[in-house]
Amino acid sequence: MSLPAAFLRDAQQLIPQERRFDDPLSTLAFGTDASFYRLIPKLVIRVESEDEVVALLQLAQRDRVPVTFRAAGTSLSGQAISDSVLIVLGDNWNGKEIRHQGSQIRLQPGVIGAQANAWLAPFGRKIGPDPASINACKIGGIVANNASGMCCGTAQNTYHTLAGIRLVLADGTRLDTEDEASVSAFRASHGPLLERLAELGRSTRANSELAAKIRHKYRLKNTTGLSLNALVDFDEPLDILSHLLVGSEGTLGFISAVTYDTVIDHPNKASALIVFPDVETCCNAVTVLKSQPVSAVELLDRRSLRSVQDKPGMPAFVQQLSANACALLIESRAASSSLLHEQLAQIMNSLAAFPVEKQVDFTEDPQENAKLWAIRKDTFPAVGAVRKTGTTVIIEDVTFPVEQLAIGVNRLIELFDKHHYDEAILFGHALEGNLHFVFTQGFNSSEEVNRYQAFMDDVAQLVAVEFGGSLKAEHGTGRNMAPFVELEWGSDAYQLMWQLKRLLDPNAILNPDVVLSEDPQIHLKHLKPLPAADEIVDKCIECGFCEPVCPSKGLTLSPRQRIVIWRDIQARKRAGIDTSELEAAYQYQGIDTCAATGLCAQRCPVGINTGELVKKLRSEHATHSGTADWLGSHFASTLQGARFTLHVANGARMLLGAPRLSKLSASLTRLSKGRVPQWNNAMPQPEKAIRFSPSVSDARPRVVYLAACVSRVMGPAAGDKEQSSLYEKTRGLLEKAGYQVVLPDNLDNLCCGQPFASKGYATQAEDKRQELIGALLHASRGGLDPIYCDTSPCTLRLVQDLGDVRLDLYDPVRFIRTHLLERLEFTPQEAPIAVHVTCSTQHLGESQALIELARRCSNNVVIPEGIHCCGFAGDKGFTTPELNAHSLRSLKDAVQYCSEGISTSRTCEIGLSQHGGIDYHGLVYLVDRVTRAKAV
């Protein structure tokens, strides 16, 4: 069925065209979330204000159009997909208000969970929920799912730390529980609804058997069904309503803002890994630890340990553990080091009577801690990495009463064996009896679907009926467990949930078939295919963890969406379906606007670099190999041509003036489809070719200086206050520190190959790289001298897969911190400095080092929030300027009190200067300004 014409007409008047999507590519891309279900929406709307949400809900109510809300799309149970209208959050939902020295924080639903904690960190506080997806998931989803996590338990989830909420009901009515005027207006307009909620609360509390059941169920971690505990925990109907919205998964209303009572984030922590000989011993230890000063206790069965035993950094003994071994990863936190040590002694004393097979003692070392927690965090992706192409990874989420945890674990393992899930692993938040089990599942045949159905029926019977546990502890009911809500809760509680749903959403327009469904087979419908597409991306589980760092997300596609569309294209081709229209749209949205810098790989739990797929696809369309060969073998001429182009651009600026040239250039770029680069105010002037011969008899320590080709071509912008070139500044700083600067021979013909690689000419790129490596070996006297490269992208290109261990290569950050700190005296400036950590700096592992260097140089360092990749991507800032503009759309406000920024990439600095409204320079400019040579 299509959407009503009246709804579409009025929605078009309400929402601009650029925020409405109904084309096949966009609806498929947005139709995907992290669950193993898929629905294709008929219309996707990106909303930027509460007023728009209100108006859309009023339209949906009028025309009986179902709507679903989406924040980050990282939920796992099918609660954020729709075959009707999908409403997704735009940029303008990132507001915050920190109160009372961080003891409270008010957040809009588009804030990423980790960002909220970053804001609270200076106060030693954090929000209570700590889901594994906290670096990607957003507050809207955290609240709507009542997400918890490893340390959160039940006491610190959203329900129990809720201080206030702003919501929109299905009829478009707003309520802000922290605004007296809003509350008064709501009481006047919705008095009967509030009285009905109060009545349901009274009758529930009066039903002693039902009330006792509700209290018992929420003693455990539980997100199955609606939050009935609101009816027994509160008398005031506004409190009931606000807490019903928590965990409602978008079925009762839209959450516009939430205020949390924050929790203490203790600075001192230690972790240990203790392996017990069997499940029973391990779970008995959990019972003891529940009364100990522990912040997290994670259980890992033998299968989960086996899945990561070959990973780097794993304790060697993991490979030799016995067949029934079961481990606990324990963390304790405290306000002081002395208190932490007391707690650790107390914890170990409590476990003294238990037999232990192996253990890693408590450590406070951050790196060792990270290694231990990597065991836990790598288990889920470990299954994903070995799954058969075409199957999906399913992670289920149940709770047993802690005192029955050992029996529950063994019974689950029996079900794995019964239904032939041999690869299934089991781990979880042991203190709460909350277990996750991960397995691979194909849905390509009725036999596989039937196997899954039989398994889930057995799991539901085991957990909900035999043990009285929770079928969803923290992942939300979604579609996945909707058919089992009545089985877990019983008829009285189930009907009570339906009463609440019909009271708050009488026309059933809010996320139908989620949490509550009249279809007993809903969990077996709309199962998502994961067809083979390319071995580079076939392991993708579509979790969405990559999306926050992608510069094109919100402009075109995210890495997850690129993979989704490419999978669909390949599946259609195999089925003989025409894909020309989809591929034509994908060329721009999937290929042309991908920065291909690979930050997505850093966030991906299975290490997928979607940029590599894009480069591969570009190579298939790279039809000018002969030209690339000529450019590579005549590189000095190529650079001279680039300098000439900059001369022409600079002349045009002086002739036409910057405003007219900018307008003309934008038109030419658009008409030429990116073939003519777009001019902007930060466009560099041409740099003269380097002419430099060091003294032969120089006795100073040598450093080989590799000036990247962009540094050799691009000088400062005409309007830049700093008119010294990067080469001049770098050479001056190195000599100030007492180094003899040596340049490779034939420098103007040398290149790392990055310009060729980014265009899909891999052969020419590698030829140039190898030529440069040979020149650097010669210049460094066989690797005797360190090699300084003045841009981090060039350094990264050289060190990746570097076979020759003789070369000692440095980017600016690493060289300054390892070679120059001891030779220079720093006098930090008071003027604020903005820092952009480039993608390559992140890949090189120098992010924190760059920030620390900046703090040596300035007492006021500004790191803009939410900008991970600038989107300039070599030359895309010239040819696809909208990518750079989109990625840096928030930069100007973030750096408004700075007069200068620093980076480690000359091309990135062009876009940063243009969109930040301040001059960005290389790190060496700042270091040179605030240092002098130390007296010998």
Each language-model region and where it sits:
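N-terminal flexible segment immediately upstream of the FAD-binding catalytic core
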Residues: M1-R62, A72-S103, T251, I255-K269, ...
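N-terminal glycine-rich flavin-associated loop
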Residues: A11, S35-V67, V85-P131, V143, ...
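C-terminal substrate-binding/cap subdomain adjacent to the FAD-binding core in PCMH-type
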Residues: I142-A144, S148-T158, L162-K377, N410, ...
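Activity-critical C-terminal alpha-helical subdomain
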Residues: A382, P483-A532
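Iron-sulfur cluster-binding electron-transfer modules in prokaryotic oxidoreductases
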Residues: D505, G611-V936
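Iron-sulfur cluster-binding cysteine motifs and their immediate structural context
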Residues: I509-V514, F545-D568, T593-E620, R797, ...
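Non-heme iron-sulfur electron-transfer modules
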Residues: L516, K553-Y586, G607-S633, D919-D928
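Ferredoxin-like iron-sulfur electron-transfer modules
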Residues: I522-E542, R574-A596
